[in-house]
């Protein structure tokens, strides 16, 4: 558990730092109370996505027909699937491709989805608010009006 936490949190903090710079440049760098519930809720969806891609796809692609292990097909397939799940948003597709390419080797080494899912959720939260200038809570509340 702890090695996965350390590596995934380091990668996430670096990406959130980059997102903060992008948000500052675009004028989207802000902290809003809507972020608080999403810090708890979005990681749940992150764990589900990590399970679907890492546990079901990447882990199975690590074995070819001869029983040998190959990281590159698993890494590329996982990264591409993460990106395709976010069509048509090109920025989000690029970010999720990089996240998938980063998190796949971490999962395959330590086989722990929890830290990856939590970090996935947190990275997604800051991506929406800071990179895209979007508030998912506000969008959701508007849909109920």
PLM region descriptions:
Residues 81-88, 106-107:
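Hydrophobic alpha-helical transmembrane segments
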């Amino acid at each position: 558990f702890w090695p996965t936490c350390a590596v995934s949190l380091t990668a996430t903090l670096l990406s959130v730092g980059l997102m903060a710079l992008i948000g500052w440049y675009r004028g989207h760098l802000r902290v809003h109370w809507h972020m608080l519930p999403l810090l708890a809720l979005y990681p749940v969806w992150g764990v589900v996505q990590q399970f679907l891609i890492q546990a079901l796809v990447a882990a199975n692609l690590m074995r070819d027909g001869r029983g040998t292990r190959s990281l590159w097909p698993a890494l590329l397939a996982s990264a591409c699937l993460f990106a395709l799940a976010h069509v048509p948003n090109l920025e989000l597709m690029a970010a999720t491709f990089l996240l998938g390419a980063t998190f796949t080797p971490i999962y395959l080494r330590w086989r722990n989805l929890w830290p990856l899912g939590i970090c996935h959720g947190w990275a997604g939260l800051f991506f929406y608010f800071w990179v895209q200038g979007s508030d998912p809570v506000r969008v959701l509340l508007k849909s109920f009006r």
